[in-house]
Amino acid sequence: MKFYKNLLVELALMASPLAAIPVSAVSWSYPTDPIQRLPFDSGEGTINAPYVITNAQQLADLSWYVNTGRTYEGAYFVLGNDIELNPGFTFEKDGTYKGEGSPKQWVPIGSGEKSVFKAHFDGCNHKITGIYQDSLVVVKDTYPSEGMHSYMGLFGYVANDTLCNITIANSLIKLNCNIEGIEDVSISVGALAGSANNSVVYNCVNEANVGIYSDSRSGCGNSFLGGLVGDMYISYEKSVNISDCHNTGAISTDLKETSTGGLFGNINGDFKMSNCSNNGDISGTWLAAGLVGETWTYVVEKTGLENLQNLGNILGNGSVAGILASNGGYISHATNCVNKGNVTSTADNSYSGGLFGQFIGGDIINCHNEGEVYGGSGIVEY
């Protein structure tokens, strides 16, 4: 599905005075005072004439508008260019960076339940590079439990939308959950979105390294970490499709009680996932897997896993697996799934397997494991 017309986008870009300016040359800042300028270059926000974002400042302005209460519910956005947020910086796999000075901190689009992005966002196969986050944005929310929460990524908190055709590259999200004066904070982190509720996600790629850590290993609540999305909640009456999504970044955490996945940390609700893969190394604690750390499903007919592949090495001290670490509920089937990475659990008692740590309900068809499994079994442990 594409919700834009190529001709309209091309015409909008031709008319834009910024279209010929290299994106890396456009400076940006997150607004600190009320602004009047629009967070897009052209468009009407409709499916046939979407809002077109062409530079980093417009993307930052969109974040400001959403975080001050505008949801853009039902509107359509597209990218008209690759967007570079920190030109001149290179972000390394070891969590360091190279460049002059310090990179600019990205403020996520949608900070929580009261500041939610509800529009459709199509990257049109463009890249967003240079996302850098090392400090949490903390709000008081009720999901997944009442208390202090932080939603980090390009988007923080999104709902009832579509995120598609976006690649996150040359970026670094490395967060410390210890904040002075806050005893307990629950964190949802993904390079694309921290939390995506009732949202369709397809053709999205993460190449960034994403991690959450603690200096003291205390003060951090139940958290969700994914290469693309930290956690997704899906209403009981719905089912969403996730397809053609891939991760190559290293995803890691030392926090206790964290669900970690190469694509999604946690999915709560019915979904179908197809044609997705992970090629990054995953290091977690409680639940860790190549694609999804944990799922909670309701209606078996609305669920399914097809054509999934893990190539990364998975390490954890709880339930660990190449595809899915733990499933609460039922999944109708898993078809054509393969794990080629090594799976290691350091826990004495855990559900760990080459493909699935825990798989309840349906059929496993034409799935196989080619990686070494330490602390579990070949395809499914339980």
At which residue positions do the language-model features occur?
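Sec-dependent, cleavable N-terminal signal peptides
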Residues: 1-26
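Surface-exposed repetitive/solenoidal architectures
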Residues: 24-382
